[in-house]
């Protein structure tokens, strides 16, 4: 499935914030679907550090949200995040090669239950893990949002 034409040069779908630069600014590399698991290399740039050599928790959550959502596109379905829970197990280092893995735990109707871990590339022990619910995007999803925001800005909340 095409991601609305918003891919990097290699064909990887990109979010709205990254389309203009043609790469993932969070540091996520090419997503690969291998059986039931989506994997991607990721490296936290030191601009996202919280403490010395440690990634900010917001960066970690953003990477989970981004890659877990894009993993459904690899399976042919565009989704939106309904909920995301992150467990921070160990400090996530900056400027180190990491791997994120995403698994589909359950899928029924529009609901996709996903789990994910981030780990060092050379170590299987998770540094952080996430689980969440993604919903298949209905036609007109973003148009409805824009209409609602236009009404809000005009003082007509819906």
Feature-to-residue mapping (PLM):
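HotDog/MaoC-like acyl-thioester-processing domains
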Residues: 1-7, 92-94, 105-158
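Non-catalytic linker/capping segments at the edges of enzyme domains
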Residues: 1-46, 155-158
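Short coil/loop residues immediately preceding or within conserved phosphate-binding loops
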Residues: 15, 81-83, 113
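Short beta-strand micro-motifs enriched in acidic
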Residues: 32-33, 103-107
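A conserved, well-ordered hydrophobic junction motif at loop->secondary-structure transitions
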Residues: 39-63
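Residue-level recognition of well-ordered beta-strand positions that form the cores
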Residues: 41-43, 85-87, 101-103, 117, ...
């Amino acid at each position: 499935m095409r991601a609305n034409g918003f891919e990097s040069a290699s064909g990887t779908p990109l979010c709205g914030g990254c389309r203009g630069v043609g790469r993932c600014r969070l540091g996520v590399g090419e997503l690969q679907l291998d059986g039931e698991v989506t994997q991607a290399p990721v490296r936290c740039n030191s601009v996202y550090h919280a403490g010395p050599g440690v990634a900010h928790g917001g960066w970690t959550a953003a990477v989970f949200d981004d890659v877990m959502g894009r993993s459904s596109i690899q399976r042919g379905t565009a989704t939106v995040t309904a909920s995301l829970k992150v467990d921070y197990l160990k400090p996530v280092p900056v400027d180190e090669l990491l791997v994120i893995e995403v698994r589909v735990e359950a899928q029924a109707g529009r609901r996709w239950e996903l789990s994910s871990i981030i780990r060092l590339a050379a170590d299987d022990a998770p540094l952080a893990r996430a689980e969440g619910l993604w919903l298949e995007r209905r036609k007109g999803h973003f148009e409805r949002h824009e209409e609602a925001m236009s009404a809000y800005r005009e003082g007509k909340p819906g």
